Amino acid sequence: TNQASVPPAIVALCAKGIVRDNQGGAMLLPTLAHTMIPRHEVAVFSGPSFADEVFSGLPAALVAAGKESATKAIQDAFEGSNLRVYRNTDTVGVALAGAMKNVIAIASGCAVGLGLGDNAKAAILTRGLSEIARFSSVLGAKSDTVFGLAGVGDLALTCAGPHSRNMAFGMALGYGEAPSGQLAEGSRTVAALA
């Protein structure tokens, strides 16, 4: 489609990950989206939620990160009796935390699959959160983001059990099984960070 014929729109980016750029470096998905659709306003929509629970009417809280106009539009469109949408300007922090927690969930799942116990899982989560905070600091993200819904909240949910694709992927690896079904987002992020 000719992009000039598409009116500017607000894009709520729900995917989480880090990809390789053309120079072999790493790029957050919002940065990639800005390069691919520069006329559109891109915001990151993330946080601790499983879509099936939200659709079932169970309570959840998410973060919309981006420019004020975009986050307000997302909040107005999605907030309801069971979903609270918080607004934030820290696109980098929300995107980075969302991507990195998937890698940590895979590692946590591996620990479960290998039978390493809850102590090892707790160590992986804690040290993983430390890594998210370090990367966030280097990239200019806000520390509040790391310790909010998009960071700790999403990390806790994603590492809670096999309902998470990334956790299930890691568990399968730990059990020595070939992961089945859809490839977990975190596996691509691992490759981009390697």
Model-found features: residue ranges?
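Rossmann-like NAD(P)(H) cofactor-binding subdomain of soluble oxidoreductases
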Residues: 1-59, 75-76
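Glycine-rich beta-alpha junction loops
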Residues: 16-18, 46-52, 67-68, 89-94, ...
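Catalytic cores of large soluble enzymes that bind and process phosphate-bearing ligands
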Residues: 25, 66, 117, 124, ...
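Amphipathic alpha-helical segments in well-structured domains
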Residues: 26-30, 125, 129, 166, ...
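Internal alpha-helical scaffold of NAD(P)-dependent oxidoreductase catalytic cores
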Residues: 35-42, 59-145
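Alpha-helical elements of the RecA-like P-loop NTPase motor core of helicases
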Residues: 52, 72, 167
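NAD(P)-dependent Rossmann-like dehydrogenase/reductase catalytic/cofactor-binding core
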Residues: 101, 108-112, 137-147, 151-194
